[in-house]
Amino acid sequence: MPLRKPAPALVTCLALLAGHPTIASASHAEDVFFEAPSQLLSPVTRPSTISTLRKLGVSALRIELSWHTVAPSANSMRRPAFNAKDPADYSWGQYDPLIEEAHRLGWRVLLTVSAPVPLWATANPRLRSLVTRPNAREFEEFMTAVGRRYAGEVSLYGIWNEPNHHEFLEPQFNADGTPASPRIYRGLYQAAYAGLRAAGIAHPATLIGETAPEGETYVRGPIRPGSAHNVAPLAFLRGVLCLDSSYRRAGGCSMLSPSGWAIHPYPNQAGPLYVPRNPESITIGALRRITGALDRAGYAHALPGSLQVYITEFGIMSKPNRYQGVPVAQQAEYDAIAERIAYSNPRVASFAQYLLKDDPMPPRGSRRVAFQTGLEYASGSPKPLLAGFPVPLTVTRLGRAYALWGYVRPARGATTVTLEGERRGSHNFSVLSLVTTDRRGYWTLRDPTTEASWRVRWVSPGGTVYVGPAIRAY
């Protein structure tokens, strides 16, 4: 599948950054939060996984902490007798050693505290739903325990995973078809913030949102419990902030003061330049929508002005996913383009990679969701993205020349990379240029040569050789 033509705004941005100087000139640095739950939460695979992530240049983790997993008597309809604010009354399991190891390595940790929840902490335990109307007061006390347990080791607290998605919070819509989850979530966010304050954290660094990329604004017809409807992220934002469709205050809600608004802007098979038709959806190619919405919310005094955007979960689905997967070579290209888009936006504070290893594919006919966004297949064999992730590269056609952007993720300071090109029909790469990065490892270059593909080679100070995959122009 050929790469699609880039959006005009992106071409303009790349054109401004392209030129003879080889050092990147972006105005901000980004965290890249890596998430590999199956491997990192297992004591068997954690050491080798940490070793792999260090080689890849990872220095920040996103960890999802399930309230249900650590709570006492989580499947009981009756709340047990315990001190919900005391960390000693919970079973933290493998979260403790993982967070301790990340702290020892000096890695930033985003801890997203989320569903499923204890059955006794729902509004109606008889429903046997672990995501329906969680009790905000109970959540506040739990967050006090979380804050006391991990203060000093966690850099950011994410409040709920994808609260606009029916698998993580119910109900999403009221019986009349209007969104229900935004107001439920607002209560949970405020409870979490108060709980962290009660833990002795004077100014908790929290992320609000963590929204799934697409959904609906209104649902027609009767809404049944458990129906698979999700609230569109911008409609969700307005509901959380008590704003009407024109971003005017629609109630007596006070301003919220999070550290940033978090999104999960997954694209579809069309790739990272895809812009959804629904103007309420947010993919990586539509970041302008979220920054515009945050500006309007700031103008309405529902949020602080110029709030930063955090991409906290992201990946490009590859084959063998039957529905959304792209070829694995294209996965590496698309992932680099997505990171380039995020890097180019000064309001974006972080990027993310969801999964080191693919989920196993479910059998045909199964309704189970599986992600093939990893750097490796489920078997552990590498995809091109395993080589591309530490040294992402994008190549954009600009008239008769090409604008190149790259990043040496494992570098700790300015370094030199070797740019190689492959002419059409040659099947061999030759050296085109030696490029100096900035102190964070980023670089740009204008290349007048006509190549079929490009790649980056870098040798670390310790002698490890990194060779990225072949990348085509787009």
Residue spans for each PLM region:
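Bacterial N-terminal signal peptides that target proteins for export
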Residues: 1-10
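Boundary/entry segment of secreted carbohydrate-active catalytic domains
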Residues: 26-60, 64-66
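Conserved, mostly hydrophobic/aromatic
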Residues: 34, 61, 102, 146, ...
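Substrate-binding cleft and catalytic face of glycoside hydrolase catalytic domains
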Residues: 56-227, 268
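Aromatic-rich peripheral "rim/lid" segments of glycoside hydrolase catalytic domains that contact
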Residues: 77-78, 149, 163, 168, ...
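C-terminal segment of classical bacterial N-terminal signal peptides
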Residues: 17-24
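Short strand-edge motifs at loop-to-beta-strand transitions and within beta-strands
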Residues: 441-445
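Noncatalytic carbohydrate-binding groove/subsite architecture in carbohydrate-active enzymes
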Residues: 43-47, 136, 140, 180-329
